Amino acid sequence: MLPEQQQQLISLIQAAVASVLPDAQAQVLLERPKVAAHGDVATNIAMQLAKPARRNPRELAQGIVDALMAETAARALVENAEIAGPGFINFRITAAARQAVIQAVAEQGEAYGHAPATGEKVLVEFVSANPTGPLHVGHARQAALGDAICRLYAATGRDVTREFYYNDAGNQIQNLAVSVQARARGIAPDSPDYPADGYKGDYIVDIAQDFIARKTLQAADGAAVTASGDVDNLDDIRVFAVAYLRREQDLDLQAFGLAFDNYYLESSLYTSGRVEQTVQALVAKGHTYEQDGALWLRTTELGTGDDKDRVMRKSEGGYTYFVPDVAYHKAKWERGFRHAVNIQGSDHHGTVARVRAGLQALEEGIPKDYPAYVLHKMVKVMRGGEEVKISKRAGSYVTLRDLIDWVGRDAVRYFLIQRRADTEFVFDIDLALSKSDENPVYYIQYAHARICSMIANAGADDARIAQADTALLTAPTEFALMQRLASFPQIVAQAAQELAPHHIAFWLRDCASDFHAWYNAERVLVDDEPLKLARLRLAATTRQVLANGLALLGVSAPQRM
């Protein structure tokens, strides 16, 4: 059912309940029966009300049904209503109500499944890689999840900002600089003179060569940087190496079809004084204490679930890594983002309570669950039945660029979204390359391309198809397909609410399956011209909604394959 049809049916049921039990107070909820033969939607409202009303639930259900079906508006929407089990009411909607989705999609087009603008600002931070190497498969999963979540937020009316937080401060940047310096001096990774914690991928050689050649380069949001070529100047090497890798990451993200609205540098939190100001504010508010020469935050007293207090400033000096995180998220709040989402690897689980505790200590008005988190698990890449662990470019891990080069952007995006973020995932390269029904990307895109080909070969112009009589669409597989198309707006809303784009991936696979089942059961290009046009109209409707769903995942909808 379309969302507006569901709301209409809920209102009609509420009116029927009021006529049977004038003083009753209960929320009417509709759900799809687990067995399709039981109906299209069902409610347990009679079971909710039976005990407080001291009524038999089945008898109460019958009274509600009688009152409901006495209304003309209800009969236009509901073909029949049956009592099942202890008091469920199962509804089967009319053919006209099923067919209404075709006109709805025709009127809304690319906006079908979308909601009006709410004006709510949302900041989604994701990828946020250290500028110390190419983006790996974990970053790839973040990129796919993050961009899809942003698209879902936009589809549900939010004003979305995509942000990349660069971890450009700390020991890893120093390790990068000395690694490039060693390579620039001709020291190989297998040499005892190579830095013990140095990076060893081929990209370090590329940086060293460009530094010596005094190349000029520019990241997406930064000023141009020209290498000095002075291999003894570690600061120059560090600045150039960071700029080089930021540019490389930008290029990888461009190849993935992803553009960020804003870049935020961790180093700016120190140069602007935000980190020190944050610490001073926490001390002034009485949420810290000194012990063993270190400064501690009383995180256990701040109601965010942390099981022990945390060190902020180490006894030997320097802040722990969660302190700049607190300063950064306070900045998000001050920038007006009352809704913020972080997409990170599951190894960041321990930081959630600490960051939230720091925010609680800084400002009472910040909700305890701010920011929201989507924590994803690892991705294992398989090829030929064996795990792929090594990339020549990165040296020790498979990169985002590797995946794009091997299977293409569409497959990478879909495969990395199709499972819940909190589950480990095996990326099967062979499956992603296969042209079979087992490959979900191929299966869905083939359905779209098949429809394009079918309509092109039908010899009917768009105007005639658009005016076709949908009342002729009464086959069971047609009803099933229309029901699937009508469910799309609810799936979009659910996926956005739960920050779970895999719901869209599942829905697309199911929709393609329903389309193929209909296509195989009912000839579309029949001799009966009105029926042919009606079926072409259903096919065109399916094509539009498939394209809308694929767009939410950042996946293309090809016209031919």
UniProtKB/Swiss-Prot annotation:
Keywords: Aminoacyl-tRNA synthetase, ATP-binding, Cytoplasm, Ligase, Nucleotide-binding, Protein biosynthesis
Protein localization: Cytoplasm
Gene Ontology cellular component annotations, sorted alphabetically: cytoplasm
Pfam families assigned: Arg_tRNA_synt_N, DALR_1, tRNA-synt_1d
Catalytic reaction equation(s): tRNA(Arg) + L-arginine + ATP = L-arginyl-tRNA(Arg) + AMP + diphosphate
Transmembrane segments: none
EC number, as in UniProt: 6.1.1.19
EC main group: ligase
Top-level lineage group: Bacteria
Motif segment ('HIGH' region): 129-139
GO BP: any one term: arginyl-tRNA aminoacylation
NCBIfam families found in the cross-reference section: argS (TIGR00456)
Complex and partners: Monomer.
Family indicated by similarity: Belongs to the class-I aminoacyl-tRNA synthetase family.
Database matches in HAMAP family: Arg_tRNA_synth
Protein name: Arginine--tRNA ligase
Organism the protein comes from: Bordetella petrii (strain ATCC BAA-461 / DSM 12804 / CCUG 43448)
Gene name as annotated: argS
